[in-house]
Amino acid sequence: FSVWAELMDDDAVEAAFGALAAQGVGVGLSLPSVRVGDAGFAKLTRKAARAGVPLRIWPLLSPEHGYWIGETNVAETRDLMASLLAWRSRRGGPVFDGVSFDLEPDFQYSEALRRCARLRPDRALSLLLDNVTPTRFAKARASLARTVQTLRRAGIVAHAVTYPVVLDQAVGDTTLEDALSIPVSGIDWDEVSFMVYQTPIAQLTGRWFGPALVRS
């Protein structure tokens, strides 16, 4: 079991290590691409290791490159993972057990979908259908699969996190993944998790469901 740390400063993350270790809880620690090579970040990961807190890196690209990992930025993702592995191998580099791939529509596409859902829900389906490009998707998935294999050969756990809607696809079908630009199936992950955001569901229903929603 792990918690996620995205917008916390290093001191706040470090302050939580004692409680996390006592509960046997790991942390998925966000790594903005601009912090690759940051000595302070590497030091934080070593402190987690000394505290007995399992740590996975959660890489995030710049907003201009999509922020989250997906179909449109597999080249940037490949380069980011190569830099991460090189940094890990150097003296004073970070210590981590795995890498979590946050597979979501890229930032610009996510914003377009959000605007449609709020202002013109009748256009949302057309936007999704326009994004279905099987050849481009297949090439992106193959590229991401190679990146994942590179990590695994280096002894790093490759963990995918994505939308549960992909579970509604028929076996062998990737249309929903393609529509959302989130290649997940057909890649040799060590582990796959599915995210459920409470806030938008509460906004739609007017009700806060709590942990039971995630369990469902």
Question: Could you tell me what each predicted segment is?
Answer:
Residues 6-36, 91-99, 187-192:
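Catalytic domains of carbohydrate-active enzymes, especially glycoside hydrolases
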Residues 28, 84-134:
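Active-site groove signature of glycoside hydrolases
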Residues 1-6, 56-58, 130-177:
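Aromatic-lined carbohydrate-recognition surfaces of secreted/lumenal glycan-active proteins
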Residues 134-159, 179-183, 187-216:
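Glycoside hydrolase catalytic-domain groove-lining segments
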Residues 71-103, 175-188:
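An active-site-proximal structural segment forming one wall of the substrate-binding cleft
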Residues 1-13, 28-41, 63-75, 108, ...:
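Acidic-and-aromatic substrate-binding clefts and catalytic sites of carbohydrate-active enzymes
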Residues 40-49, 54-91:
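Active-site-adjacent "subsite" loops/lids of carbohydrate-active enzymes
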Residues 2, 24-28, 52-58, 96-100, ...:
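Structural preference for beta-strand elements that scaffold enzyme active sites
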